[in-house]
């Protein structure tokens, strides 16, 4: 037996106090008063955090109460049947029970969709243009300043060809270009180095997505054919999305979590 389970063993051997249930009930009844007293006495940042916590609890409580009310609501359809036959012009009207079922199904689908497209990092720090781009001065007397060099890691495809130097506005240094990512599969618990296919979405800006900038929170598409994943139809999965969880420009590599 583990050394820290002596209380559980004592309960199994000797049982609980004779007034255990009564003490438990009274303690639960006092919780509201204790919470009220704590809310009145607390000051500063602790008070703000506590009020925010209570607000979330109340919102959740209201949602739960609403769900119970919907479940326990009387159904008009059953009342109409008990009162008598339904008129002809009301036969095509949906019963409340059916409407409730449809509503529940729609809510469940929304929850599943939200879970499907949820990402490990829902919020990331914003990156300023000054941090993202470095101004490159050109011209004989270095007066032109319309060129920008990207200071973050980037991805460019195999078929990428640079524009002529005179017309190239955004410069992506070779040292910061990444072609592979260390992708972790959460369910399998393995990490593999997979080739990057493309950049799906950069949370900072659509321009950064177009330029293939890899920052923390960026959703990329990786080649997962090596993992041997198959669809329900038996076809091999070629590409899947993954979200970058580190700062590639600081670490020198791309670490990502596969979105399942």
Curated annotation (Swiss-Prot):
Cellular component GO terms held in the UniProt record: nucleolus; nucleus; preribosome; preribosome, large subunit precursor
InterPro entries per record: NSA2_fam (IPR039411), Ribosomal_Se8/biogenesis_NSA2 (IPR022309)
Record carries keyword Phosphoprotein: yes
Bias (Basic and acidic residues) ranges: 53-73
Motif Nuclear localization signal positions after renumbering to this chain: 11-18
Similarity field: Belongs to the eukaryotic ribosomal protein eS8 family. Ribosome biogenesis protein NSA2 subfamily.
Protein name, UniProt field: Ribosome biogenesis protein nsa2
Naturally occurring in which organism (per UniProt): Schizosaccharomyces pombe (strain 972 / ATCC 24843)
